[in-house]
C-alpha cells in the first residue's frame, strides 16, 4: 500500500507482514547531483553512483569519493554519538520527519568483510573483535548505565519463542551485575570490516532489523558479545571455532569493565553469556524468516544443544541444593543443642556439615558451564 508522504526521490509504502506493519521509504529516481531537503553535516557535491549493492552506494563526486547508505525504515542517531570514537559515524545525512533516510561517509569502503576474515585468520580476527567490543562496553558503561531489567529481557525471549514456534524455552536469572547500557543491538557481519588487523564497526543504525526485532536501546553490553559469538558460529571453520570463541571472550574481558566481565557477572548458572547467544540465534532466525531466506543450519545446530546445556545446569543445581542443606544443618545443630535436643558430643557434626557444604559448593561452581 502506497503512502503519499515521502521526500523527493523516494516513494512511501506501508509494508504488512506477519511480524507487523511498517512504513518504508523506497529510493526512486533520486537525484544524487543535487541533494536537497533536510540535510545535515557534510554531503557530496554533484555526485553520481559508480557502484551499488542493496542499500549501499559508492559515489563519485566533485569533491572526491563518497559512500552512502539508504535507510528504508528510517533511523535516529540519538544516543550512539557517545561511541563516535569507536564506531564509524556518518559525516552527514538526509533527514525526513525526524528520521534519517540517507547517511554519507567520505572515501571508499576499506578492508575485507568480517565473514572473509573469520575464514582467513579466525583467531586473530576474534581477538581484535573482542577487544573492540570490550572498549565499546567500557565507554558505554561510563556514559550510561541503567538498572537490571531481567523481566523485560526475559519477556522478549518469550515473545520471540512464541513467534518462531521454537522447541526451546529459556529464561535467565541474570546476576545483579548485568545492567543495561548503550549497545550495538543487532551486530551483523555486513556491518563489520577488518583493516590491517583492526576492526571497523558500522551499520548500527539499523534497517529492518531495528524495526522488526524491537530491541530496546538499553541492553547489557554482554549482548553484543553474544551477537558476535553467533557470527563466529556462522562463518568460522569448525576446526578453529572453539579456540576462536575462547579468544573472542577473553579479549572482550580484557577490555570491558570488571563489573560486567567478572566471574560472577559471567556466571553460567545465571545464564551468563549463553542466554545472550541464545537470543542472538533467535534474532538470526527471525530475520531469516522475515526476509524469506533459508534458515541457517548453524542456528538449528546450536538451538538443538539448548536442552543439553539446560540439563547440565539443572544437575549442577542439585549440588547447590545439597550444599545449602549442609550449611543449614550446621546452623540447626547448635540451635538443637541450646534447646536441649542434642548433647555436646554431637556438636562435632557442625564442622562436618560445614566442610561438606563448602565441598559441595565448590563442586557446584566447578560444574558451571564454561563462559565460552
Name the predicted role of every residue range.
Residues 196, 207-260, 277-294:
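Active-site activation/catalytic loop segments of kinase-like enzymes and analogous catalytic loops
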Residues 200-204:
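Pre-DFG segment of protein kinase catalytic domains
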Residues 2-169, 212-239, 356:
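Conserved ATP-binding subdomain of kinase catalytic cores across diverse folds
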Residues 177-191:
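Catalytic-loop of the protein kinase fold
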Residues 336-354:
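Hydrophobic alpha-helical transmembrane segments
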Residues 335, 355-366:
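Alpha-helical transmembrane segments
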Residues 115-118, 366-372:
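Cytosolic/matrix-facing juxtamembrane and C-terminal tails of multi-pass cellular membrane proteins
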Residues 301-330:
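Cytosolic-side membrane-insertion boundary helix
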Amino acid at each position: 500500500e502506497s503512502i503519499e508522504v515521502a521526500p523527493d526521490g523516494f516513494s512511501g509504502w506501508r509494508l504488512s507482514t506477519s511480524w507487523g506493519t511498517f512504513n518504508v521509504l523506497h529510493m526512486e529516481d533520486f537525484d544524487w547531483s543535487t541533494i536537497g531537503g533536510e540535510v545535515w553535516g557534510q554531503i557530496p557535491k554533484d555526485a553520481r553512483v559508480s557502484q551499488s549493492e542493496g542499500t549501499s552506494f559508492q559515489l563519485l563526486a566533485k569533491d572526491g569519493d563518497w559512500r552512502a547508505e539508504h535507510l528504508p525504515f528510517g533511523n535516529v542517531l540519538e544516543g550512539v554519538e557517545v561511541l563516535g570514537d569507536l564506531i564509524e559515524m556518518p559525516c552527514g545525512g538526509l533527514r525526513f520527519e525526524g528520521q534519517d533516510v540517507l547517511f554519507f561517509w567520505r572515501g571508499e569502503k576499506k578492508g575485507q568483510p568480517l565473514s572473509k576474515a573469520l575464514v582467513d585468520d579466525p583467531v586473530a580476527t576474534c581477538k581484535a573483535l573482542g577487544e573492540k567490543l570490550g572498549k565499546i562496553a567500557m565507554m558505554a558503561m561510563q556514559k550510561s548505565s541503567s538498572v537490571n531489567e531481567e523481566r523485560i529481557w526475559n519477556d522478549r525471549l518469550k515473545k520471540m519463542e512464541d513467534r518462531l514456534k521454537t522447541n526451546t524455552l529459556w529464561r535467565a536469572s541474570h546476576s545483579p551485575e548485568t545492567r543495561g547500557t548503550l549497545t550495538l543491538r543487532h551486530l551483523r557481519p555486513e556491518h563489520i570490516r577488518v583493516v590491517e588487523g583492526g576492526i571497523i564497526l558500522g551499520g548500527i543504525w539499523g534497517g529492518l532489523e531495528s524495526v522488526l526485532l524491537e530491541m530496546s536501546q538499553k541492553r547489557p553490553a554482554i549482548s553484543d558479545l553474544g551477537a558476535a559469538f553467533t557470527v563466529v558460529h556462522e562463518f568460522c571453520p569448525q576446526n578453529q571455532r572453539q579456540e576462536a570463541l575462547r579468544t573472542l571472550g577473553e579479549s572482550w574481558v580484557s577490555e570491558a569493565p570488571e563489573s560486567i566481565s567478572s566471574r560472577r557477572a559471567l556466571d553460567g548458572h545465571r545464564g551468563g553469556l549463553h542466554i545472550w547467544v541464545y537470543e542472538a540465534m533467535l534474532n538470526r532466525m527471525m530475520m531469516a524468516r522475515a526476509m524469506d531466506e533459508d534458515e541457517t543450519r548453524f542456528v538449528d545446530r546450536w538451538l538443538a544443544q539448548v536442552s543439553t546445556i539446560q540439563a547440565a545446569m539443572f544437575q549442577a543445581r542439585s549440588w547447590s541444593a545439597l550444599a545449602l542443606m549442609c550449611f543449614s544443618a550446621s546452623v540447626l545443630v547448635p540451635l538443637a543443642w541450646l534447646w536441649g535436643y542434642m548433647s555436646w558430643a554431637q556438636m562435632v557434626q557442625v564442622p562436618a556439615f560445614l566442610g561438606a557444604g563448602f565441598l559441595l559448593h565448590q563442586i557446584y561452581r566447578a560444574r558451571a558451564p564454561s563462559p565460552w
